[in-house]
Structure formats: structure tokens, C-alpha cells
Amino acid sequence: MSDTAVADTRRLNSKPQDLTDAYGPPSNFLEIDIFNPQTVGVGRARFTTYEVRMRTNLPIFKLKESCVRRRYSDFEWLKNELERDSKIVVPPLPGKALKRHPFRGDEGIFEESFIEERRQGLEQFINKIAGHPLAQNERCLHMFLQEEAIDRNYVAGKVLGEKDC
């Protein structure tokens, strides 16, 4: 084996890790949880909302922690906005109904098992989107995660980070 091959396989020098390094917060993180589903309303006006909790230290987000309540149609709005205005491939949302019930108007969407399955699917959806570097700059994502009410008449565009100002 040549000397250059041996030199290329040597380990890089690294500093020893202490407890602060090992158990401190990661350098950049974005955590989004969907939890606490609540079904509200009666009859045809009945729907389920979910709490969307975000924690981050990414400088692009104005709030480091937020918790908002969203319904399925809000996730549909976000998906449509991202498909219309961004350059990212948007993953699919979980299905709208568990199964067809020909004599039931709600199609099983208020059954606990369906609500939990949808919650998991929505959590996967939002984490895939939020994990994409280009999506993190989209104003619609920031509004979805951090503002109590979604302004559906907002002006689409990019969010300027601290370094962009």
C-alpha cells in the first residue's frame, strides 16, 4: 500500500467530547408535533382540529416556539400554496376519508382510529415539508406554523432570514 493511501485512511483529529457537547441542544433543529385532536361542531358543521407545536432554533423563524390549532382543510391550503408557488415536490396528504359509508355523511372520519391515523399522516406530511430547506423560506409555511389565524389573502413569497436583511 502506498504512503498516500495510508494517509488517506487515517482518522481525522477530533477534540474529545464533554457532557455539554453530548447532551446540549443540536446545532440546528426543527421539531413539529401534531397532537391533541379535538372534534368540534355538530352535524355537517362537525370537524376535527389538531394542535401543531413547533420548536426550533433556526434563525429564519421569528418564533422559537409556537402552538396553533389546525384542521385538515388548513393542511390542504398549505399543500396547494406550496405546489403553486415553490420549487419543491410536495408530499401527498393522508386520505380524506377512511372508507365510504353510503348511508353515513361523515364517512367514518370521526372514528378514533381514523383520527389517529390521520394525525400520524399529517405529522409526517408537515415534517417532510418543514425539513426541506427551500420550504423553510416560504411565507405560507411560517404562517401555518406560527400564526393563530391563516390569512388566506396573504401575499405569497419568501421569508427573509436575519442574514438576508
Curated annotation (Swiss-Prot):
Classification via Pfam families: PX
Keyword Zinc-finger set for record: no
Modified sites of kind Phosphotyrosine: Y23
GO molecular function, one term: phosphatidylinositol binding
N-acetylserine found at: S2
UniProt key word Cytoplasm: no
Domain of life: Eukaryota
Modification type Phosphoserine: residues: S73
Binding-site positions, a 1,2-diacyl-sn-glycero-3-phospho-(1D-myo-inositol-3-phosphate): R71, S73, K96, R118
Localization per Swiss-Prot or TrEMBL: Membrane
GO biological process terms held by the UniProt record: protein transport
Keywords: Acetylation, Lipid-binding, Membrane, Phosphoprotein, Protein transport, Transport
PX domain boundaries: 28-151
InterPro entries: PX_dom (IPR001683), PX_dom_sf (IPR036871), Sorting_Nexin (IPR051074)
Bilayer topology: Peripheral membrane protein
Gene Ontology CC annotations of this record: membrane
Region (Disordered): 1-20
Family: Belongs to the sorting nexin family.
Domain commentary: The PX domain mediates interaction with membranes enriched in phosphatidylinositol 3-phosphate.
Summary of the function given for this chain in its UniProt record: May be involved in several stages of intracellular trafficking.
Protein name according to UniProt: Sorting nexin-12
Species of origin: Mus musculus (Mouse)
Lineage: Eukaryota, Metazoa, Chordata, Craniata, Vertebrata
Gene name of this polypeptide: Snx12
